[in-house]
Amino acid sequence: MEAPAQLLFLLLLWLPDTTREIVMTQSPPTLSLSPGERVTLSCRASQSVSSSYLTWYQQKPGQAPRLLIYGASTRATSIPARFSGSGSGTDFTLTISSLQPEDFAVYYCQQDYNLP
């Protein structure tokens, strides 16, 4: 039996202007998982964000972030169907239907609704 790998899940902040910031809080911060499992990652915004501006990224050590999902639910080019995104308002989700060995990475949500 393969030992579970660590899937890291971090917090990303955007500072939209001098008066208000949108804080994106992701949970859980880490997961111990095995290949084949279903994974659900959550992202909550401190204020409502248009779905059109919500993106998810995957990052592996030593590599640039890879765009997975844009517009909250649209897969980027060449992203496998096991990745799906959903949500609106303040609550968004990234789901990996069956975790593959190559999916062990850091995942970020980002909002582009309000930028600095």
UniProtKB/Swiss-Prot annotation:
Q: Which domain of life is it from?
A: Eukaryota
Question: Which InterPro entries did the record assign?
Answer: Ig-like_dom, Ig-like_dom_sf, Ig-like_fold, Ig_sub, Ig_V-set, IgV_Light_Chain
- Function of the protein: Probable non-functional open reading frame (ORF) of V region of the variable domain of immunoglobulin light chains. Non-functional ORF generally cannot participate in the synthesis of a productive immunoglobulin chain due to altered V-(D)-J or switch recombination and/or splicing site (at mRNA level) and/or conserved amino acid change (protein level). Immunoglobulins, also known as antibodies, are membrane-bound or secreted glycoproteins produced by B lymphocytes.
Residue segments, region Framework-1: 21-43
What residue ranges are annotated as transmembrane? none
Q: Which cysteine residues pair off into disulfide bonds?
A: 43-109
Q: Where is this region: Framework-2?
A: 56-70
Q: Which UniProt keywords apply?
A: Adaptive immunity, Cell membrane, Disulfide bond, Immunity, Immunoglobulin, Immunoglobulin domain, Membrane, Secreted, Signal
Q: Which organism is it from?
A: Homo sapiens
Entry GO CC: extracellular region; immunoglobulin complex; plasma membrane
Q: Please give the biological process terms from Gene Ontology that the record holds.
A: adaptive immune response; immune response
* Classification via SUPFAM superfamilies: Immunoglobulin
| Gene3D superfamilies cross-referenced by the UniProt entry | Immunoglobulins
- What is the designated name of this protein? Probable non-functional immunoglobulin kappa variable 3-7
Q: Where is the signal peptide?
A: 1-21
The annotated subunit structure for this chain is:
Immunoglobulins are composed of two identical heavy chains and two identical light chains; disulfide-linked.
Region Complementarity-determining-3, annotated ranges: 110-116
Q: Does the keyword Transmembrane apply?
A: no
Primary subcellular site in the record, as a coarse category: secreted
